[in-house]
UniProtKB/Swiss-Prot annotation:
Disulfide bonds: none annotated. Belongs to the universal ribosomal protein uL30 family. Pfam families: Ribosomal_L30, Ribosomal_L30_N. GO terms for biological process: maturation of LSU-rRNA from tricistronic rRNA transcript (SSU-rRNA, 5.8S rRNA, LSU-rRNA). This is Large ribosomal subunit protein uL30B. GO terms for molecular function: RNA binding; structural constituent of ribosome. Residues 1-45 are annotated as: Disordered. It comes from Paramecium tetraurelia. CDD domains: Ribosomal_L7_archeal_euk. Binds to G-rich structures in 28S rRNA and in mRNAs. Plays a regulatory role in the translation apparatus; inhibits cell-free translation of mRNAs. Transmembrane segments: none annotated. NCBIfam families: uL30_euk (TIGR01310). GO terms for cellular component: cytosolic large ribosomal subunit.
Length: 248
Protein backbone atom coordinates (compact mmCIF):
# COMPACT_ATOMS: atom_id res chain seq x y z
CA UNK A 1 0.00 0.00 0.00
CA UNK A 2 1.57 3.21 -1.19
CA UNK A 3 1.63 6.19 1.11
CA UNK A 4 0.53 9.56 -0.19
CA UNK A 5 2.60 12.46 0.91
CA UNK A 6 0.48 15.31 2.06
CA UNK A 7 1.82 18.84 1.94
CA UNK A 8 1.01 20.60 5.11
CA UNK A 9 1.12 24.38 4.97
CA UNK A 10 2.01 25.77 8.28
CA UNK A 11 1.19 29.39 8.81
CA UNK A 12 3.90 31.06 10.80
CA UNK A 13 2.65 33.91 12.93
CA UNK A 14 4.85 37.03 12.81
CA UNK A 15 5.80 38.20 16.29
CA UNK A 16 3.92 41.34 17.30
CA UNK A 17 7.07 43.41 17.94
CA UNK A 18 8.43 42.55 14.47
CA UNK A 19 5.11 43.46 12.84
CA UNK A 20 5.04 46.81 14.63
CA UNK A 21 8.63 47.56 13.62
CA UNK A 22 7.89 46.71 10.00
CA UNK A 23 4.86 49.00 10.10
CA UNK A 24 6.88 51.82 11.66
CA UNK A 25 9.65 51.44 9.09
CA UNK A 26 7.12 51.53 6.27
CA UNK A 27 5.50 54.70 7.63
CA UNK A 28 8.93 56.28 8.11
CA UNK A 29 9.93 55.50 4.51
CA UNK A 30 6.66 56.98 3.27
CA UNK A 31 7.15 60.11 5.38
CA UNK A 32 10.74 60.56 4.16
CA UNK A 33 9.65 60.10 0.55
CA UNK A 34 6.82 62.60 1.03
CA UNK A 35 9.14 65.19 2.58
CA UNK A 36 11.63 64.70 -0.25
CA UNK A 37 8.91 65.20 -2.86
CA UNK A 38 7.66 68.32 -1.07
CA UNK A 39 11.21 69.66 -0.74
CA UNK A 40 11.94 69.14 -4.44
CA UNK A 41 8.67 70.85 -5.37
CA UNK A 42 9.43 73.77 -3.03
CA UNK A 43 12.95 74.12 -4.45
CA UNK A 44 11.57 74.12 -7.98
CA UNK A 45 9.09 76.85 -7.03
CA UNK A 46 11.84 78.93 -5.37
CA UNK A 47 14.14 78.58 -8.37
CA UNK A 48 11.35 79.73 -10.67
CA UNK A 49 10.70 82.72 -8.39
CA UNK A 50 14.42 83.60 -8.26
CA UNK A 51 14.60 83.51 -12.05
CA UNK A 52 11.48 85.65 -12.37
CA UNK A 53 12.88 88.18 -9.90
CA UNK A 54 16.23 88.31 -11.72
CA UNK A 55 14.42 89.02 -14.99
CA UNK A 56 12.43 91.81 -13.34
CA UNK A 57 15.63 93.38 -12.00
CA UNK A 58 17.24 93.18 -15.44
CA UNK A 59 14.26 94.97 -16.97
CA UNK A 60 14.48 97.62 -14.22
CA UNK A 61 18.21 98.14 -14.86
CA UNK A 62 17.71 98.45 -18.62
CA UNK A 63 14.91 100.98 -18.11
CA UNK A 64 17.14 103.05 -15.80
CA UNK A 65 20.01 102.97 -18.32
CA UNK A 66 17.66 103.99 -21.13
CA UNK A 67 16.26 106.84 -19.04
CA UNK A 68 19.78 108.14 -18.38
CA UNK A 69 20.68 108.04 -22.09
CA UNK A 70 17.40 109.74 -23.03
CA UNK A 71 17.96 112.52 -20.48
CA UNK A 72 21.51 113.11 -21.69
CA UNK A 73 20.35 113.29 -25.32
CA UNK A 74 17.51 115.64 -24.43
CA UNK A 75 19.84 117.97 -22.53
CA UNK A 76 22.30 117.98 -25.44
CA UNK A 77 19.54 118.69 -27.96
CA UNK A 78 18.21 121.57 -25.89
CA UNK A 79 21.69 122.94 -25.30
CA UNK A 80 21.52 122.34 -21.57
CA UNK A 81 23.08 120.04 -19.01
CA UNK A 82 21.77 116.93 -17.31
CA UNK A 83 22.79 116.54 -13.69
CA UNK A 84 22.46 112.93 -12.48
CA UNK A 85 21.18 112.23 -8.99
CA UNK A 86 23.80 112.30 -6.27
CA UNK A 87 25.46 108.98 -5.56
CA UNK A 88 24.06 107.06 -2.60
CA UNK A 89 26.74 104.36 -2.48
CA UNK A 90 30.52 104.42 -2.13
CA UNK A 91 32.98 101.56 -2.47
CA UNK A 92 36.01 102.03 -0.22
CA UNK A 93 39.28 100.11 -0.65
CA UNK A 94 42.09 100.11 1.90
CA UNK A 95 45.45 100.63 0.17
CA UNK A 96 47.76 101.55 3.07
CA UNK A 97 48.28 101.10 6.76
CA UNK A 98 49.98 97.82 7.57
CA UNK A 99 52.24 99.26 10.27
CA UNK A 100 51.38 101.21 13.42
CA UNK A 101 48.39 103.48 13.04
CA UNK A 102 46.83 106.26 15.03
CA UNK A 103 44.24 104.56 17.32
CA UNK A 104 41.46 106.77 15.96
CA UNK A 105 42.39 105.89 12.38
CA UNK A 106 42.57 102.19 13.23
CA UNK A 107 39.14 102.27 14.89
CA UNK A 108 37.59 104.11 11.96
CA UNK A 109 39.02 101.59 9.50
CA UNK A 110 37.49 98.81 11.59
CA UNK A 111 34.10 100.53 11.58
CA UNK A 112 34.34 100.66 7.79
CA UNK A 113 35.16 96.90 7.77
CA UNK A 114 38.65 97.65 6.43
CA UNK A 115 40.79 95.69 8.88
CA UNK A 116 43.32 94.45 6.34
CA UNK A 117 45.22 95.77 3.35
CA UNK A 118 43.17 95.50 0.12
CA UNK A 119 39.90 95.02 2.01
CA UNK A 120 36.93 96.64 0.28
CA UNK A 121 33.47 97.50 1.58
CA UNK A 122 30.28 99.27 0.56
CA UNK A 123 29.32 102.44 2.43
CA UNK A 124 26.03 104.32 2.32
CA UNK A 125 26.62 108.01 1.67
CA UNK A 126 25.59 110.25 4.55
CA UNK A 127 27.17 112.92 6.72
CA UNK A 128 28.55 110.44 9.27
CA UNK A 129 30.17 108.12 6.72
CA UNK A 130 31.67 111.02 4.79
CA UNK A 131 33.32 112.22 8.01
CA UNK A 132 34.64 108.72 8.68
CA UNK A 133 36.16 108.46 5.22
CA UNK A 134 37.82 111.86 5.60
CA UNK A 135 39.52 110.66 8.80
CA UNK A 136 41.16 107.74 6.97
CA UNK A 137 41.42 109.24 3.48
CA UNK A 138 45.24 108.90 3.14
CA UNK A 139 44.85 105.14 3.72
CA UNK A 140 41.98 104.41 1.33
CA UNK A 141 40.73 105.06 -2.15
CA UNK A 142 37.04 105.21 -2.97
CA UNK A 143 34.42 106.07 -5.53
CA UNK A 144 31.07 105.17 -7.01
CA UNK A 145 30.80 101.49 -7.97
CA UNK A 146 29.03 100.46 -11.15
CA UNK A 147 26.34 97.81 -11.12
CA UNK A 148 28.69 95.45 -12.98
CA UNK A 149 31.44 95.85 -10.37
CA UNK A 150 28.98 95.33 -7.50
CA UNK A 151 27.78 92.14 -9.16
CA UNK A 152 31.31 90.85 -9.81
CA UNK A 153 32.40 91.57 -6.25
CA UNK A 154 29.49 89.66 -4.74
CA UNK A 155 29.67 86.74 -7.16
CA UNK A 156 33.46 86.36 -7.21
CA UNK A 157 34.58 87.67 -3.82
CA UNK A 158 31.42 87.58 -1.74
CA UNK A 159 31.39 85.88 1.66
CA UNK A 160 28.74 86.01 4.35
CA UNK A 161 29.32 86.94 7.97
CA UNK A 162 27.33 84.44 10.04
CA UNK A 163 27.87 84.20 13.80
CA UNK A 164 31.27 85.83 13.37
CA UNK A 165 32.32 83.25 10.79
CA UNK A 166 33.34 83.89 7.16
CA UNK A 167 31.03 81.64 5.15
CA UNK A 168 31.18 81.27 1.34
CA UNK A 169 27.97 82.22 -0.48
CA UNK A 170 27.65 78.95 -2.37
CA UNK A 171 23.90 79.12 -3.00
CA UNK A 172 20.80 81.20 -2.36
CA UNK A 173 19.88 79.18 0.73
CA UNK A 174 22.69 80.88 2.68
CA UNK A 175 21.17 84.26 1.84
CA UNK A 176 17.56 83.21 2.40
CA UNK A 177 18.26 81.79 5.85
CA UNK A 178 19.85 85.04 7.03
CA UNK A 179 17.96 87.72 5.08
CA UNK A 180 14.70 86.09 4.03
CA UNK A 181 12.90 87.86 6.87
CA UNK A 182 13.59 91.22 5.17
CA UNK A 183 12.64 90.01 1.70
CA UNK A 184 16.13 89.18 0.41
CA UNK A 185 16.03 85.59 -0.81
CA UNK A 186 18.68 85.31 -3.52
CA UNK A 187 22.00 86.71 -4.67
CA UNK A 188 20.17 88.88 -7.21
CA UNK A 189 18.02 90.29 -4.38
CA UNK A 190 21.23 91.02 -2.47
CA UNK A 191 22.86 92.75 -5.47
CA UNK A 192 19.71 94.80 -6.07
CA UNK A 193 19.50 95.91 -2.42
CA UNK A 194 23.14 97.03 -2.43
CA UNK A 195 22.96 98.68 -5.87
CA UNK A 196 19.83 100.68 -5.11
CA UNK A 197 20.72 101.27 -1.44
CA UNK A 198 17.30 99.88 -0.62
CA UNK A 199 15.36 99.98 2.66
CA UNK A 200 17.24 96.96 3.99
CA UNK A 201 20.70 98.03 2.84
CA UNK A 202 21.96 97.97 6.44
CA UNK A 203 21.03 94.30 6.90
CA UNK A 204 22.35 93.35 3.46
CA UNK A 205 25.68 95.13 3.93
CA UNK A 206 26.09 93.76 7.46
CA UNK A 207 25.56 90.27 6.04
CA UNK A 208 28.54 90.70 3.69
CA UNK A 209 32.05 90.07 4.96
CA UNK A 210 34.60 92.66 3.80
CA UNK A 211 35.81 91.80 0.31
CA UNK A 212 39.37 90.50 0.24
CA UNK A 213 40.97 91.76 -2.95
CA UNK A 214 44.44 91.23 -4.36
CA UNK A 215 46.97 93.88 -5.31
CA UNK A 216 45.97 95.49 -8.61
CA UNK A 217 47.46 94.11 -11.81
CA UNK A 218 50.17 96.59 -12.77
CA UNK A 219 50.43 97.83 -9.19
CA UNK A 220 49.65 101.21 -7.67
CA UNK A 221 51.15 104.48 -8.89
CA UNK A 222 52.04 106.33 -5.70
CA UNK A 223 50.13 105.39 -2.56
CA UNK A 224 51.50 108.35 -0.60
CA UNK A 225 50.03 110.88 -3.04
CA UNK A 226 46.38 111.68 -3.59
CA UNK A 227 44.58 110.62 -6.73
CA UNK A 228 44.12 114.21 -7.89
CA UNK A 229 47.92 114.63 -7.61
CA UNK A 230 48.67 111.60 -9.81
CA UNK A 231 48.69 109.27 -6.82
CA UNK A 232 46.34 106.64 -5.40
CA UNK A 233 44.52 107.64 -2.22
CA UNK A 234 41.30 109.60 -2.14
CA UNK A 235 38.23 109.99 -4.31
CA UNK A 236 38.35 108.41 -7.79
CA UNK A 237 34.63 108.87 -8.45
CA UNK A 238 33.65 106.49 -11.30
CA UNK A 239 37.28 105.51 -11.93
CA UNK A 240 37.17 103.31 -8.82
CA UNK A 241 35.65 100.69 -11.12
CA UNK A 242 38.80 100.45 -13.26
CA UNK A 243 40.94 99.86 -10.17
CA UNK A 244 38.64 97.29 -8.58
CA UNK A 245 38.39 95.30 -11.83
CA UNK A 246 42.17 94.89 -11.63
CA UNK A 247 41.90 93.72 -8.01
CA UNK A 248 39.07 91.16 -8.25
Amino acid sequence: MSQKKQKIQVEQKVPENVAKKTQRDSKLRDAVAKRRTERLAANKTRRAQWEKTAQAYEAEYKAADKSLVDNLRKAKTEGGFYVPAEAKLILVVRIRGINTLNPQVRQTLRLLKLRQLHNAAFVRVNKATIEMIRKVEPYVTYGYPSRAVIKNLIYKRGYAKINGQRIPITNNNVIEQQLGKVGIHSVEDLIHEITTVGPHFKEANRFLWAFKLRGPRGGFIAKRRSFINQGDWGNREDLINDLVKRMI
